[in-house]
UniProtKB/Swiss-Prot annotation:
One of its GO terms (molecular function) is GTP binding. The lineage of its organism: Bacteria, Pseudomonadati, Pseudomonadota, Gammaproteobacteria, Pasteurellales. This is Translation initiation factor IF-2. Residues 1-11, 79-161, 211-237 have a biased composition (Basic and acidic residues). Residues 200-210 have a biased composition (Basic residues). Belongs to the TRAFAC class translation factor GTPase superfamily. Classic translation factor GTPase family. IF-2 subfamily.
Length: 844
């Protein structure tokens, strides 16, 4: 088309288009009227655009031809230069070779002249070597020239490809231009149509009668305009018809062939979400894996290190376990290691069944009346005392409770001890707590010395004790074993000296030593909260010397030793190995059994204590969440279970533990004891408020409520109980639980009547004439009708008469008329059994 356009052609070409149509319209009178409508369209085409396009295309072709010519010239030039260089190099080498040949020929000629043409083999060899060198040099020059020519050709090819891409882009621009010009023409046609429609719509009444046809036309034209505008815009930015970009503009990323397995660093505790984040997987994947392992978890649940390691290894990751207590190890490891060890006194724990005379024996040894001070003569917590012998030797005694509730306290006593003295009553023999004490001693690896107590009683039988202990692998020396049996009487003091000698002999065999001058370490035997002095801990020093002013790290607590007292309440400035002391100055009440260690830096001690608290909280939370999930379905199936809420306050930590454990063991399937709060020290207003909120009873063990707490307790009518003996506490809690049990109902037969005759009454139906053979027949009690000792009806009486009078009851041996409600099939020989439902109280 562009080639046919001549140079003298007009710049613009206008085309007129005229069409005539007839439109019939209805007038107001109902007659149809025909109107002649002439439509004129004018289109102008600019011819110079085609000329510009032709000129542009010609310029592009010329530029392309020029580039191709330049490329060929460059290739030819590079080839000629390479050939020229190779020829020049070859000529140079040839001239050099000829020159060398001429030089070598001169002496050869003179030699021939002088020696009658003698041929030298060395010269022949040199000639061959020179020829070889020349050939190699020519080969290298030729290869170099070929390489240069190849590079020049590649570069020319790259330029040609770049030119081709430029030509393609210019042709795309040209097609875009054609496309846009086509859209411009369509837009002009649309504008003409819109002007015609505007001219037609002058008569508004007629437009209204058409029912909105023009509105639809205008809507359609508007949609078309928007569509055209969008298409034009998309064409400009290289998009397709549906608005999506072409594939040439899209970036594609290849999916990795396999998942990258990273190293996972796991601390002591971690949540499921954190573990998923570290492994770059979804949390649901971890939950699925743990469900396969039999564990139900949530996304925010804390799991321990071992579980997290199993999950990570299951998913194919390498696990790095991180030890979070590095600071703790560093602080505890900073000790005096080169200090000299010396012989120390033995720590002896006296264990045995309740009321077998442990405290009385220790009392006689200490020469002080302690047993009278204990409530009911029962030891409620560990007492620690040290006794000095006549020869200057010292023994430290720990007195543990014998009651079943104090198992954990006995276990602590056995762990802190060197020798266990097992007290067995000669008249009572081996009892449950005796067996338990033997097990604790074996678990702690402490040797036993058996004290057979109460030998002064007439019914005492020490031989029976030895026989019974044989069944529990406690073999006396008499039977070839290594356990010393010493008969004693705590009341009269018989055999006590022999017992002390046996203890010292056993300690010499053990060769007990400890560092005396280093930093102290020990174990908390007992702890409590004193109202005036604050937290008090009874610490048994095991190595080193504990001095006043030392910084002590004790479980979750820390502090400076402000004051120390011995078992008699006397102030002391230091305590060496095997000496028990009461320590004041800790930040809180430590748990009995915690290790007490002297450290150098108070700041680091605080950091370690806070770290331990946080770790304990996380582990406790993880355990609670696990228990909640595990018990969820069982709790749903159990339904409502009665709960007895209790708040426990005691004088020492060990007693709190023992009472809470004993109360939890009292729980049954119907009534559960829930300890909502426990602590060491007096009963405060906070405890009373908690009891009000949780509807709990407050149990005080060797403690009392202060004035503010008493006011709240009286105002809210809270049940407050004080105890000093654990037997009474447990029995009363059992009674309270029994009151919460659902009552049982029992049926008791109170009377029996035999049917002798049956009368028919028009109003009451069948009336049984009966003789009361047993008990009393009562009018308002339920009855059963028996025939041949088989119950055939159960209901109630409608009437009970004696002669013509209505009566409430008829006694044994009397006749009466009985009408059974809703039952008329009474026969002679039947028995009418009268019973009552009695409530039976249950107990635990």
């Amino acid at each position: 088309m562009t080639e046919d356009v001549k140079a003298d052609a007009p710049k613009k070409l206008s085309i007129q288009r005229r069409t005539k149509t007839t439109v019939s319209s209805t007038t107001t009178g109902g007659k149809s009227k025909e109107v002649q409508v002439e439509v004129r369209k004018k289109r102008t085409v600019k011819t110079d655009i085609a000329q510009q396009e032709e000129a542009k295309l010609k310029a592009q072709q010329e530029a392309e031809a020029k580039k191709i010519a330049e490329q060929k010239a460059a290739e030819e030039k590079a080839r000629l230069e390479a050939e020229k260089a190779a020829t020049k190099k070859e000529a140079d080498e040839k001239s050099k070779a000829e020159k060398a040949k001429a030089e070598t020929a001169k002496p050869a000629k003179s030699a021939v002249d002088s020696k009658a043409k003698f041929v030298d083999p060395e010269k022949e060899k040199r000639k061959a070597e020179e020829a070889e060198l020349r050939r190699k040099a020519e080969e290298v020059a030729r290869q170099k020239a070929e390489e240069q020519a190849r590079r020049a050709a590649e570069e020319a090819k790259r330029y040609a490809e770049a030119d081709d891409s430029d030509n393609e882009s210019s042709s795309e621009d040209y097609s875009d231009y054609n496309l846009s010009s086509r859209y411009a023409l369509e837009a002009e046609d649309e504008e003409d149509r819109r002007n015609e429609n505007r001219g037609r719509g002058k008569n508004k009444v007629a437009k209204a009668k058409k029912g909105g046809r023009d509105d639809e036309n205008s809507k359609n034209s508007k949609n078309e305009r928007e569509s055209n505008r969008k298409n034009q815009k998309d064409a400009k930015f290289g998009k397709g018809k549906n608005g999506k970009k072409g594939t040439a503009l899209q970036q594609a990323f290849t999916k990795p062939v396999q998942v990258v397995k990273a190293d996972v660093v796991i601390g002591e505790t971690i949540t499921v979400a954190e573990l998923a984040n570290k492994m770059s997987v979804k949390a649901t994947e971890i939950i699925k894996v743990m469900m396969k392992m039999g564990e139900m978890v949530t996304i925010n649940q804390v799991i321990d290190q071992e579980t997290a390691q199993l999950v990570a290894e299951e998913l194919g990751h390498k696990v790095i376990l991180r030890n979070e207590n590095e600071l703790e190890e560093a602080v505890l490891g900073d000790r005096d290691v080169n200090a000299e060890k010396v012989t120390r006194a033995p720590v002896v724990t006296i264990m045995g069944h309740v009321d077998h005379g442990k405290t009385s024996l220790l009392d006689y040894i200490r020469k002080a009346k302690v047993a009278a001070g204990e409530a009911g003569g029962i030891t409620q917590h560990i007492g620690a005392y040290h006794v000095e012998m006549d020869d200057g030797k010292m023994i430290t005694f720990l007195d543990t409770p014998g009651h079943a509730a104090f198992t954990s306290m006995r276990a602590r006593g056995a762990k802190a001890t060197d020798i266990v003295v097992l007290v067995v009553a000669a008249d009572d023999g081996v009892m449950p707590q005796t067996i338990e004490a033997i097990q604790h001693a074996k678990a702690a690896g402490a040797p036993l010395v058996v004290a057979v107590n109460k030998i002064d009683k007439p019914e005492a039988n020490p031989d029976r004790v030895e026989q019974e202990l044989l069944q529990h692998d406690v073999i006396s020396e008499k039977f070839g074993g290594d356990v010393q049996f010493v008969p004693v009487s705590a009341k009269k003091g018989t055999g006590v000296d022999d017992l002390l000698d046996a203890i010292l002999l056993q300690s010499e065999v053990l060769e007990l030593t400890a560092v005396k001058d280093g930093m102290a370490s020990g174990v908390v035997i007992e702890s409590y909260l004193d109202k005036g002095r604050g937290p008090v801990a009874t610490i048994l020093v095991q190595s080193g010397t504990l001095r006043k002013g030392d910084i002590v790290l004790c479980g979750f607590e820390y502090g400076r030793a402000r004051a120390m007292r011995d078992e008699n309440g006397k102030e002391v400035d230091e305590a060496g190995p095997s000496i028990p002391v009461e320590l004041l100055g800790l930040s809180g009440v430590p748990a009995a059994g915690d290790e007490a260690t002297v450290v150098r830096d108070e700041k680091k001690a605080r950091e370690v204590a806070l770290y331990r608290q946080g770790k304990f909280r996380e582990v406790k939370l993880a355990r609670q969440q696990k228990a909640k999930l595990e018990n969820m379905f069982s709790n749903m199936s159990e339904g409502d279970v009665a709960e007895l809420n209790v708040i426990v306050k005691a004088d020492v930590q060990g007693s709190v533990e023992a009472i809470v454990q004993a109360l939890n063991e009292l729980s049954t399937n119907e009534v559960k004891v829930k300890v909502v709060g426990s602590g060491v020290g007096g009963i405060t207003e906070t405890d009373a408020t908690l009891a009000t909120a949780s509807n709990a009873i407050i149990v005080g063990f060797n403690v009392r409520a202060d004035a503010t707490a008493r006011r709240v307790i009286e105002a809210e009518n809270i049940d407050l109980r004080y105890y000093s003996i654990i037997y009474e506490l447990l029995n009363e809690i059992k009674a309270a639980m029994s009151g919460m049990l659902e009552p049982e109902f029992k049926q008791e037969i109170i009377g029996l009547a035999e049917v002798r005759d049956v009368f028919r009454h028009p109003k009451f139906g069948a009336i049984a004439g009966c003789m009361v053979t047993e008990g009393v027949v009562k009018r308002n009690n339920p009855i059963r009708v028996l025939r041949d000792n088989v119950v055939i009806f159960e209901g109630e009486l409608e009437s009970l008469r004696r002669f013509k009078d209505d009566v409430s009851e008829v006694r044994n041996g009397m006749e009466c008329g009985i009408g059974v409600k809703n039952y008329n099939d009474v026969k002679v020989g039947d028995q009418i059994e009268v019973f009552e439902v009695v409530e039976v109280k249950r107990s635990i």
